[in-house]
Structures are given as C-alpha cells and as structure tokens.
From Swiss-Prot:
It holds the Pfam family DXP_reductoisom. GO terms for molecular function: 1-deoxy-D-xylulose-5-phosphate reductoisomerase activity; manganese ion binding; NADPH binding. NCBIfam families: Dxr, PRK05447.1-1, PRK12464.1. 1-deoxy-D-xylulose 5-phosphate binds at residues 125, 151-152, 186, 209, 222, 227-228, 231. It is an enzyme of class 1 (oxidoreductase). The lineage of its organism: Bacteria, Pseudomonadati, Pseudomonadota, Gammaproteobacteria, Vibrionales. It comes from Vibrio cholerae serotype O1 (strain ATCC 39315 / El Tor Inaba N16961). This is 1-deoxy-D-xylulose 5-phosphate reductoisomerase. Catalyzes the NADPH-dependent rearrangement and reduction of 1-deoxy-D-xylulose-5-phosphate (DXP) to 2-C-methyl-D-erythritol 4-phosphate (MEP).
C-alpha cells in the first residue's frame, strides 16, 4: 500500500487525488494533508480521511482547525507553516507525495520530498519552472521518482519508452528515435475572440475554461496561455529537449492531451476525457493502472478533432515563456514570479487582462538586463530572485495605476 502526503489537499488537484484514493482504498492511504487557509474544507477532509497530520499555512488557520478537531475528539496532529509542510513531505512512513500547492509556495515542500527520495507526483509546475537544473540534480542525487501529473506531461510520459520514463531530466530523445514532442493546449476561452475585446475581459470570463475544471489562477493562465508556457518550460526540463524538439499546438477539444512524433514518421498520442483523475491515477499507481472513476472516451460522440498553429499576437505570454525557457534560469524564475503578481492583480480587478503580458514583459526585460545565470546556483539565490522579480512587478503595477 502506498502512503501519501497531499500538498494542496483543498484544491482541485487535491480533490481529484482523493477521488482516486476513494476508488482504490486497498492501494492508497493518507498520512498527511497540507493546505493554505481553507479551514472549513480541511476540517471536512480530516473528518473523512482521519490523517495523522494536518498542516495549514498560518498559525491562525491551524489554531482554528485545532479547535474544531478538539471538539470532535480527533487525534490528527495540527501543524502550520512552511517548515511543517517540508517535514510532512519527508516523513519516513510516507513513500508518495502529491505536490499540488499552487505557485512558488510549493517549491520548498516539493524539494523536501525530492531530497527525501519520495515518489513525487508533480502537479506544481512552478517548482521546475523556478528551479530547473537544481530540481533535476536533486532528483538524481536522492533517487527520488518523478512522475508528471499535468495532463500534458503525463500524456507525453505515457507515449515514451520505459528507458526515458525512468531517466526524466537526463534522457536523450533522439537516441530513442524521437523527433519532437507536441504539447497541445485548448487555447482557452478567448481563442476566437476579437483581439480588440481582450482589453475588457473580466475575471469571471477568464476563469470560465471551456473544457477543464481548475482553480482561478491556473484558469487565468490558461486564458493567457501562460499555463502552456509554464508547461513548455516544465517539459523542457522533464524531457531534456532542445528548442527544435518541443512544439506547441492548439487543440480546442482537449481530447488529445499531447503527442510524441518519432523519426520514422509515427505519432503516438494519449487521449482521454478532460479529467485530472486519469493522469493522477496513472502517476500514483505506475507502472500499474487503477480505476480512476473517469468515464471511457466515447469515440462515437466525438464530432471532430481540430488543430491550429499558435497565434502569438493573441497569446504574448506564451511567446515570453518560450523565449525565457532558453534564456536561462533567471528568466524563467522571474517570469513566473511576475506572472503570479500580475494574475493576482487581475483577479482583484486592479489591472486589465491584457496588462498581464505587459507586466510580465517589463519584469522579464528588467531582470534579464541586471542578472545572469550565475545568480542561480542554489535555492536561496533563486528565492531571492523570485522576491526581487515580485518587487519589480509591484513597482510596475504602481506605475500603471499612477
């Protein structure tokens, strides 16, 4: 039986993970649940799953949860803060860690799981975007098992030979007859919108993704296609690709989750309903397969599968991410930080939808003008760079609002 810590238990990935565990109680059990400040949801999960540990982001949230659990005479130990998150990610009696804390906040707990040699189910793409080579090196040094959970990377993983699956980050695609990887994306809710109307897009419109059910931040990232940009960077590190070996394609139906094109002309694709329980169950049970509670894809109901080239005028954030990917670690770390600040400001109605790309561009340019790869030797310097990029982003925000 696999014993899990779930980082990000109250989010959408956490919910899908628990759905898979509920379907397969003989194969998986929960040791620790980790969340931000959603006490009501965490209390509900503690009642249902009875974890040994529950970790909240803040002391006040932990105190509130502790009070609720005490009233029910529950034995779950309540902890709080980043150090506690890292602690439960590295517990001896845990062998699998679902890394699903959104954004830069997930980096240190995810890295703690890696350094402890766990099977790390990587749903937090920002961890790789921010730390790249450091992350891959830590996986190699500890013997951790890296399993991609993002539907696209999981799809690519399923389309690759076993030799590459067991050598993520250090594989040679061409040696195994692979020409390139095709990363698919739906294009989000505005793929057919008049470009002139994007200025006036509301947070509610941006969050309404046509195919996937996701949290607010990732939904906005899908609308700008920054999400695909972050996935592009993650794919570069996971599959050790050159620029020529990694391509992005718009696929509105989200049925083909990604494809691998081989040198002999063959293309292997992974298809399925757009439900995160499928890639999560695959990553949890690998190399076996278990019930995910997802309906089978009904080919008779598929009207068509269509594909389009990316229009970078519509998706400038994707272009920024693809360029940053091959500029160096300083570029991807700072772009991710700027984007988190910009998306948060958009969700709070402080800026327009189209301002997200402008802020990202300005911060990236400023960081690249003052920093080089030499600044990214360790986690501390990466976190300093992250802080600096956020400071720049807040400065740009103030200037735009002045």
């Amino acid at each position: 039986m696999r014993k899990l810590t779930i980082l990000g238990a109250t989010g959408s990935i956490g919910a899908s993970t628990l759905k898979v565990i509920a379907q397969n109680p003989q194969q998986f059990s929960i040791v620790a649940l980790v969340a931000g400040v959603n006490v009501a949801k965490m209390y509900q999960l503690c009642q249902q799953w009875r974890p040994k540990y529950a970790v909240m982001a803040t002391a006040s949230a932990a105190s509130e949860l502790q009070g609720l659990l005490k009233n029910q005479a529950m034995a779950t130990e309540v902890l709080y803060g980043e150090e506690a998150m890292c602690q439960v990610a590295a517990l001896d009696d845990v062998d699998t860690v679902m890394a699903a804390i959104v954004g830069a906040a997930g980096l240190l707990p995810t890295m703690a799981a890696v350094k402890a040699g766990k099977r790390v189910l990587l749903a937090n793409k920002e961890a790789l975007v921010m730390s790249g080579q450091l992350f891959i090196d830590a996986v190699a040094q500890s013997g951790a098992e890296l399993m991609p959970v993002d539907s696209e990377h999981n799809a690519i993983f399923q389309c690759l030979p076993t030799e590459i699956q067991t050598q993520l980050g250090r594989c040679d695609l061409s040696q195994h007859g692979i020409d390139h990887i095709l990363l698919t994306g739906s294009g989000g809710p505005f793929r057919y919108s008049d470009l002139a109307t994007l200025d006036s897009v509301t947070p509610e419109q941006a969050i309404a993704h046509p195919n996937w059910s996701m949290g607010p931040k990732i939904s906005v990232d899908s609308a700008t296609m920054m999400n695909k940009g972050l996935e592009y960077i993650e794919a570069k590190w996971l599959f050790n690709t050159s620029r020529e070996q990694l391509k992005v394609l718009i696929h509105p139906q989200s049925v083909i989750h990604s494809m691998v094109q081989y040198q002999d002309g063959s293309v292997i694709a992974q298809l399925g309903e757009p439900d995160m329980a499928t890639p999560i169950s695959y990553a949890m049970a690998y190399p076996e397969r278990v019930t995910a509670g997802v309906p089978a894809l009904d080919f008779t109901r598929l009207q068509q599968l269509t594909f389009m080239e990316v229009d970078f005028a519509r998706y400038p954030c994707l272009q920024l991410a693809m360029d940053a990917c091959f500029l160096g670690q300083h570029a991807t770390t700072s772009l991710n930080a700027a984007n988190e600040v910009a998306v948060d400001a958009f969700l709070k109605r402080k800026i327009r939808f189209t301002d997200i790309a402008l802020i990202n561009d300005q911060v990236l340019s400023k960081v690249c003008a003052t920093n080089t790869q030499l600044h990214c030797r360790d986690l501390e310097s990466l976190l300093e760079l992250d802080t600096m990029a956020r400071h720049f982003a807040h400065q740009v925000l103030k200037e735009r609002q002045a």
